[in-house]
């Protein structure tokens, strides 16, 4: 059976060349007589796998030596609690709420200290990133007042299709970012952040691995709370090389393959060029369409998640059903917002996006305003 055009928001499409490599090595990894699935995480062979994955990621992102790279489990959701557990030393952190996942992180942090709402776009149904001048002014005021342990953002909002195109100016306050759905989609200056993390299942690999990149000084004294579970202690995880317990060995192996694929296909600058070409093909179509309309403000558009709708729930459902008949899968919008969403992550090809665009045009020709008025 031919592969479908997969626009899933995560777990998402993987590069076909990576899938082929994994299949080729499944029964016998490089002549060792066993699968990576069967390999001890304490073996020298597996240590080489995890070391290579980290080294490749460090090259891709030019990660400075004073940052640790961790391969953890529990997804972004575990980090909603893990970040305040490790960083909320004064008991006060700032949150910018631009969608569902940022809001979850904000509410979770409030269990451990004062979570200060610095800005939100909930008043316009999260269709934008708040004005950066207002964000920066609020950060400066809070930092000068009672202080902030960190400022937290979700850099790309998978559900609502928005993205920061400019980072907040946090001064000496560490910036913490969930970059799950934009990780490795374009260049990123790690030194602008105190901590970033990403669920691997969108752009970096298979579900089950969370990549955490954290600056040494933020974890040097251990977690902020004595009762922090050992697994959540980032200092301990760093000291143990992500092997405090058995890690997701196969997931990390897949991540390493994806990191290498990104590097071999031109790195992050080339990836960004391809990704914006894919996204802009759909954004341009939406601007010209009389049937479909995008749901985000133009200056906040995501590189990865393009959200749109017709304004008619029944027509949206018909579009999704028809897409499946054309081998176009996973374009139904998130259950919280409805409509449609095309996630055009790294492994989604221009051919995939062109197939979707062609179907959108054909659907509009059949169901557009001119047809409904006849």
Report residues per predicted region.
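Conserved PLP-binding catalytic core of the aspartate aminotransferase-like
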Residues: 292-322
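PLP-dependent enzyme catalytic core of the Aspartate aminotransferase-like
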Residues: 2-4, 334, 338-374
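A glycine-/small-polar-enriched, mobile loop at the entrance of the PLP active site in fold-type I
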Residues: 3-54
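Active-site phosphate-binding strand-loop segment of PLP-dependent enzymes
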Residues: 10, 109, 121-183
